[in-house]
Design a protein with these regions (language model features):
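Active-site-facing substrate-recognition patch
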Residues: 1-48
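Structural motif
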Residues: 53-54, 103-105, 133
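Glycine-rich helix-loop-beta junction characteristic of Rossmann-like nucleotide cofactor-binding loops
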Residues: 45-50, 95-99
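Short, glycine/charge-rich flexible loops or terminal/linker lids adjacent to PRPP-binding catalytic cores
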Residues: 65-108, 112-121
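Alpha-helix N-cap/loop-to-helix initiation residues
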Residues: 62, 113, 141-142
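PRPP-dependent phosphoribosyltransferase catalytic core
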Residues: 3-20, 51, 119-171
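Short glycine-rich phosphate-binding loop at a beta-alpha junction
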Residues: 50-60
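Short glycine-rich anion-binding loops that position phosphate/pyrophosphate groups of nucleotides
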Residues: 60-62, 154
Length: 171
C-alpha cells in the first residue's frame, strides 16, 4: 500500500515522534476512506471466517462504525464501541452487562505501547471476555508483539541498529 507509506512518511517529516505524530497519524487515517476500507479487507483476510466479537475505540472507532457499522454487525458476533482518550489514561467504559462473544479482536488506527488495548482488555476480562488479536494500521512498537497484526510496521521500514551477538562477543 504505497499510498499509506507515502502519507506516513510525510507525517514523520512534519512530526518525527511523540503525541503530535500520533495525533496527526490518527487524523489522517480517520479522514481517508480508502485506507479504512483497505484496513477492513486486511482484517477480514486474516480472520478468514472465524467468528469473533470486535472492539473499536475513540474517534477511529467512530469513523469505522460510521462507514462500516452494518458490515461490522454482519461479520462479527458482537460489536463494542469504547470511549476514546485511552492512551492518555482515560478509563474505558463498556456499556454492556453481558457480552455477545468471549473472544474479541481489537481494531485501532495505531499501536505503540499497548496502553489502549491493555486498558480495554482489563475491563473486558471483568466481563469474561478477552482480546485474542489486535489489528492496527500503524504499528510503532519497538518490539513486535505476536498478537498485533499491522498494515505498516515502523521498525520494519526503519529498523533500529543494534549490534548483533557476534559484534558483542568480539568486543
Amino acid at each position: 500500500m504505497n499510498r499509506l507509506n507515502e502519507k506516513i512518511a510525510e507525517i514523520l517529516r512534519q512530526h518525527p515522534e511523540g503525541e503530535p505524530f500520533f495525533d496527526a497519524l490518527d487524523a489522517m487515517i480517520r479522514g481517508d476512506q480508502n485506507i479504512l476500507e483497505a484496513f477492513l479487507h486486511f482484517v477480514y483476510s486474516k480472520i478468514e471466517g472465524k467468528r469473533f466479537g470486535v472492539i473499536l475505540s475513540g474517534n477511529f472507532g467512530n469513523a469505522m462504525f460510521s462507514a462500516y457499522g452494518l458490515d461490522l454487525y454482519q461479520n462479527f458476533s458482537d460489536v463494542i464501541l469504547v470511549s476514546g482518550g485511552l492512551r492518555r489514561g482515560e478509563i474505558p467504559v463498556i456499556f454492556k452487562e453481558r457480552l455477545g462473544a468471549t473472544d474479541y479482536i481489537f481494531l485501532d488506527d495505531s499501536f505503540y505501547s499497548g496502553t489502549t488495548r491493555n486498558s480495554i482488555a482489563s475491563v473486558l476480562g471483568s466481563l469474561n471476555g478477552r482480546i485474542v488479536k489486535t489489528f492496527v494500521i500503524y504499528d510503532g512498537a519497538k518490539v513486535r508483539q505476536k498478537d498485533v497484526l499491522s498494515m505498516f510496521r515502523y521498525f520494519d521500514k526503519y529498523p533500529i541498529e543494534y549490534p548483533g551477538i557476534d559484534d558483542i562477543v568480539s568486543l
